[in-house]
Amino acid sequence: MELQGLNDFIFWRYDSNGNVITDSDKGGVTYDGNKGKVFDPKTKEEFKGLFKVDLESSKGATQANLTGLAESVQRVYGSNYVAEITTGTAQPQAALAANDIPHAVSDTLIGLVKDELGGYARKGQAKPTQGGLIIHSYNPWNSIDFYFAFPMGIYVPGELNLQTNAENPTVVHDAMTLNAQARGTDQLLYEKFYSNEPGFDYGKMIKFITGQSAVDATADNKKATDTQGQPLSDH
């Protein structure tokens, strides 16, 4: 299916028990009003602890480059022919970028710890930051919203290269990478969602990927809905 552009992406952090961190004093995200908050389009329920990187909250998401989706292949030869083929485990990565994520959000996501001096520090033996990610794109020809979801992974910071020249300063944007891993409860590595599928429901997708529901409940609703929670047949 053709996809055009990057609408937004949503990220969050987990605590040591695998629960989404909702308390900003314990490593959760902070908000400026409703900017960055994620809501269920049907019930208007807020999904606490999640942050949406979009035009309003971060001057726009600019990149979600996915690599490592394919399994590695190893060929075993015998008698001058390929006798056996084995496949390894996929090792996905999502390289993310945005124009202006609030620093309190991006620094916390990559594991920096705020101190009383107004700084965000990383010590020599930093603990990995576990979190998840949902990337949102769109197919305009069939009006399909597409979501690529990673329920679990480790966030690491991107590089920072500050420069200037004789005329203009060089603009540097936010960058980070999610190294995906399978979720322990169900071994889910990643999942694709399509808004035109009969079982799709935005709110249930969020709850399933973030671990707020123990099973995939998206199949309970057999009527496809758009991102506003309205049945497609009503359009």
What do the predicted segments below correspond to?
Residues 110-117, 121-163:
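Short helix-loop boundary/capping segments
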Residues 56-84, 88-93:
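N-terminal, charged/glycine-rich beta-strand/loop interface patches
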Residues 153-235:
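Mixed-charge, glycine-accented linear interaction segment located at domain edges/termini
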Residues 82-105, 170-183:
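Oligomerization/assembly interface segments of phage tail-like spikes and tubes
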Residues 6, 91-93, 130-132, 145-147, ...:
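Extracellular structured ligand-interaction cores
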Residues 1-59, 230-235:
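Polar/acidic, low-complexity leader/linker segments enriched in S/T/G and N/D
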Residues 3, 43, 102-129, 196, ...:
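Core alpha/beta structural scaffold of self-assembling particle/tube/pore-forming proteins
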Residues 85-88, 122-125, 162-172:
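Exposed beta-sheet edge/beta-hairpin loop segments within beta-rich domains
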